[in-house]
Structures are given as C-alpha cells and as structure tokens.
UniProtKB/Swiss-Prot annotation:
Binding-site list for ATP: V18, G60, C61, G62, K63, T64, E65, D250, E315, R387
Annotated compartments: Cytoplasm
Keywords, in A-Z order: ATP-binding, Chaperone, Cytoplasm, Nucleotide-binding, Stress response
Organism name: Methylorubrum extorquens (strain CM4 / NCIMB 13688)
UniProt family annotation: Belongs to the ClpX chaperone family. HslU subfamily.
Domain of life: Bacteria
Major localisation: cytoplasm
Annotated protein name in UniProt: ATP-dependent protease ATPase subunit HslU
Entry function: ATPase subunit of a proteasome-like degradation complex; this subunit has chaperone activity. The binding of ATP and its subsequent hydrolysis by HslU are essential for unfolding of protein substrates subsequently hydrolyzed by HslV. HslU recognizes the N-terminal part of its protein substrates and unfolds these before they are guided to HslV for hydrolysis.
Oligomer and partners: A double ring-shaped homohexamer of HslV is capped on each side by a ring-shaped HslU homohexamer. The assembly of the HslU/HslV complex is dependent on binding of ATP.
UniProt-listed GO biological process terms: protein unfolding; proteolysis involved in protein catabolic process
C-alpha cells in the first residue's frame, strides 16, 4: 500500500494528466485516508468507512486515465471495470458480486508476487538444479554438474533445448467450461472450470521442450509457489482486499434509468439496486472464502451527457458522497497534452518516426494549430475531449508515416501551415469532419 502524501500523489498524477486539480485532489485524499485508517487502533478503525467518490465530466477529459495511473500508484488491490458489463441478479450475465471475486483474484496475484520476491533466492537455486538435471541428468557426477553450472551462469547454454515438466497453472490445458452469457463466471463461489479440471485430473504436467533461457521464468515461478503457503497467502490477500481494495466503476451514467422507458431494465436500474449493498458493505462468497466489502473504496465515474447524476437511485447517490466535476479541456490544455506530459503525443510520434531514421521537428505554431483544430472540431461535431488530438495528429502525419521508410536521414519540419494544409479544409466542413475527424 502506498505511503505517498496527497501532495505527492497529485504531483505524480500531474506527470501524465493535464489539469483536473479537483479530481486529483479527491482521489489523493481518498488514497491517503486508506493509510490513515490503518494507523488507528481498536474499534474506531472498523467504524471509519471510506468516502466513495463520483467523478462527473465530459468524455475524454481524463477520468479513466486518472484510474489507470492511480492503479499503478496505489500499491493495493485495484480493479477498473465498466458498470455496463453487469446485469441484474436472476438474468443471464454477470452479477455485480463478480466485482469482488475479480478484486480478490487481483489481490491474490499481488500478494503472490510479494511472497515470490521473499523466496526468490531459494527458488532460483531450485530452478537451476532442475535445469542441470535436464541438461546432464540427476545421476551425473558433481564435477560435471559444477562445470555445467558455470556455463549456465555465464549464459553459454541459453540457446540449448531441454525437456522439462511444468505443472499447469489453474485449469490450464483443460477446456473452458462456461455458463452461456457468463464468461469466466462462477456458480456462487465455485468456478466450474477449476472444479472440472480437478475432477478430470487436469493438474498433471506435460513434458515440454524449450530453451534454457525460456525455462528459467516458469521454473522460478513454480519453485516459488512450492515454498509459499497457499492458505496463508489467500488469507493475507483477502485481508488486504478488505482493508485496502479499490474499485473504479467506469461508465456509471450508462446504467441510469431512461425516462419514458418501460419494461425490463436488467442492465440499468436493477444493477444500481444490486450495487447498493456492495458499496454500503456486505459479505460476498468467493471460492477463496467470504469477503467483506465494508472498507473497499468505490470510485464511480461517468460523462452524464445524456443522463444526470440525479437520475441515479437516491440511495446510490447517498453512497457516493464526494462529488467531483471534471472540466472540459481548453486550447491551453490541449497544448499541454501534446507537449508537457511525460509520454505526450508529440514525444510518442517523434520517437516512432526516429525508428525509421526520420526526424520530426514540430514548431510552436504547429502545436498551437493542432490544439485549435481539435477544439474547433470538438465544438462543431461531437466533443470527445483529448481523444480528438490523436485523430487530428494522425491525419497530419499520415503522409510522412506512409513514406518514412524511403526518407531515412531526413528532418521534416512541421509548422502551422503544414497542419492547416492537412486538416483545415476538413475541420471547416462540419459534414465531412463528422465522418473523418
């Protein structure tokens, strides 16, 4: 779990996301509050509930990107999922409790990685012994083994093929048994594929011929897992999920009930009703054991351009007490997105062309022109936010990208005139840009 201060979290998000200070502050405070709660002692710790967040903002303004970057920062079980994937309990499809089951799998993966790091040295020694057995046989003399061990450590045998037996992970090698309309689903807490895999003896490994270099990673993972207590790992992962789990529910505006619509609404209001106990705090049965959701942080986000936040069920609104409004992007924001972020679009484009030996030289007025065209098209056609920049930029460098292989060693200047020449006629014609930009 991260111990960054709210200021450090915001500055980390600033490296990749332009503007949206309010949203960054809200998620930074929420993340820090997880750590603060851990410092409390006694019954008060159980009483402190997370303050769930609802992020409201137009498409392409950075809601999902904040979630992606937060996942890397959190150092805790984090799941990003779309609310539109679920249907009401009792209908074909995934029910919302699958969110918690997926989060537990993420938590187990994170905890397993930590445990593997702790036993890495022992696992590497065991993997090396297995590779030596495959190379020279278990009955070889100590001198022969030591000779091969030296070559192995000097990477001289990396290309040599060996035959090793690897245990399949989970139900690998077994056909997938799925309930129609519910991919990867569980019947209650039991995963059908896992159950049938065990019943049909799917745990036996098959010998495989692979190179020594390729054998290391799976063997180290397998030997690490032998040294790790699975039951203790699962208990620790569930505890981590219950205390520090974060769920990012995207596209929540798409499950608002539409006015004037009648009939079954199995993936809208029904899903909202099912989310209520999950967000408030309930116990979900998973194949690893029961999981309490009382202290899982939920961050919901939506564009709300067709519906309004007030269209959500009042009970659900009450369970998302912190509202953050993200602002539409301006010309200045677009210029920052093109140049200022750590992996900006201009840096990406220049780096891609350099692989062909072509140097792109974007002038200041070219960047200004790109930003203005994107804003104009967003205003006249459909506002898709920062995603519009990718469309405009691709159109500008389309010709260079196509002929780059023949222009190795060239430096191509891109100025405002070049940008206007490529896109302005389309940007000016609203009907054309509706289909092309």
């Amino acid at each position: 779990m991260t111990t960054f201060s709210p200021r450090e979290i915001v500055s980390e998000l600033d490296r990749f996301i332009v503007g949206q200070k309010d949203a960054k502050r809200a998620v930074a405070i929420a993340l820090r509050n997880r750590w603060r709660r851990q410092q409390l002692k006694g019954p008060l710790r159980d009483e402190v509930a997370p303050k769930n967040i609802l992020m409201i903002g137009p498409t392409g303004c950075g809601k999902t990107e904040i979630a992606r970057r937060l996942a890397r920062l959190a150092g805790a079980p984090f799941l990003k999922i779309e609310a539109t994937k679920f249907t009401e309990v009792g209908y074909v499809g995934r029910d919302v409790e699958q969110i918690v089951r997926d989060l537990v799998e993420v938590g187990i993966g994170l905890t397993r990685e930590e445990k593997r790091k702790a036993v890495k040295a022992k696992a590497e020694a065991a993997a090396e012994s297995r590779i030596l057995d495959a190379l020279v046989g278990p009955t070889a003399s100590q001198a022969t083994r030591e000779s091969f061990r030296k070559k192995l450590r000097a990477s001289e045998l990396d290309d040599k093929e060996v035959e090793i037996e690897l245990a399949p992970s989970g139900s690998q090698g077994m056909p997938m048994f799925e309930i129609p309309g519910m991919p990867g689903a569980s019947m209650g807490a039991i995963n059908i594929s896992d159950m049938l895999g065990k019943a049909l003896g799917g745990q036996r490994g098959k010998p495989r011929r692979i190179t020594v270099a390729e054998a290391y990673a799976p063997l180290i993972a397998e030997e690490s897992d032998k040294l790790v207590d699975d039951d203790a790992l699962t208990r620790e992962a569930i505890r981590e999920v219950e205390d520090n789990g974060i769920v990012f529910l995207d596209e929540i505006d798409k499950i608002c009930a539409r006015e004037g619509r009648s009939g079954a609404d199995v993936s809208r209001e029904g899903v909202q009703r099912d989310l209520l106990p999950l967000i408030e705090g309930t116990t979900v049965a998973t194949k690893h054991g029961p999981v309490k959701t009382d202290h899982i942080l939920f961050i919901a986000s939506g564009a709300f351009h067709v519906s309004k936040p007030s269209d959500l069920l009042p009970e659900l609104q009450g369970r998302l007490p912190i509202r953050v409004e993200l602002q539409p992007l301006t010309v200045e924001d677009f210029k920052q997105i093109l140049t200022a972020t750590e992996a900006s679009l201009i840096k990406q484009t220049v780096a891609l062309m350099e692989t062909e030996g072509v140097t792109l030289d974007f002038t200041e007025d070219a960047i200004d022109a790109l930003a203005r065209v994107a804003v104009e098209v967003n205003g006249s056609v459909e506002n898709i936010g920062a995603r519009r920049l990718q469309t405009v930029l691709e159109r500008v460098i389309d010709e260079i990208s196509f002929t780059a292989t023949d222009r190795s060693g060239e430096t191509v200047p891109i100025d405002a005139a070049y940008v206007r020449d490529r896109v302005e006629d389309l940007a000016a014609n609203a009907d054309l840009s509706r289909f092309i930009l």
